Amino acid sequence: MAKNTVSARFRKVDVDEYDENKFVDEEEAGEGQQGPDEGEVDSAIRGGNMMGALQAVLKNPPINTKNQSAKDQAEHLVLKVLISFKANEIEKAVQSLDKNSMDLLMKYIYKGFESPSDNSSAVLLQWHEKALAVAGVGSIVRVLTARKTV
């Protein structure tokens, strides 16, 4: 038989601390992320440096923030850059991106598909075709299963 004790020390252990599925709000980590620098992106577009504009717009994504206006502004800025590209420059731009930037680009492409504007769907389909050819199906799987959205 078990020994009857009056001790309550076992109740001081927080078992939820060791649960890997426990939700942890990461809002504090994303406070500094307000999205890409709009001035830098606009100056690159005006200067004709489309590769620089693409790199700048993918540089500081508002992934860890819950600020929806920052996410919408970043989405609008990315869409503006993608539309500014000529059709024959898209493949070269996609090939210049690394794996993380490619996944981020795919996130923005799918986000653009959620709310299509005038001719954005055609441009996004061109970008999706080129990105899929370079990154493969794995990029789509990573985007669709990611918990952090843009």
Curated annotation (Swiss-Prot):
Family annotation (Pfam families): P16-Arc
GO molecular function ontology, one term from the record: actin filament binding
Record keyword Amino-acid biosynthesis present: no
Keyword line: Actin-binding, Cell projection, Cytoplasm, Cytoskeleton, Nucleus
One of the protein's GO biological processes: cell migration
Signal peptide location: none
Subcellular localization: Cytoplasm, Cytoskeleton; Cell projection; Nucleus
SUPFAM superfamilies named in the record: Arp2/3 complex 16 kDa subunit ARPC5
Nucleus is among the record's keywords: yes
Family annotation (InterPro entries): ARPC5, ARPC5_sf
One CC-aspect GO term: nucleus
Assigned protein family: Belongs to the ARPC5 family.
Protein name, UniProt field: Actin-related protein 2/3 complex subunit 5-C
Organism for this UniProt entry: Xenopus laevis
The gene coding this protein: arpc5-c
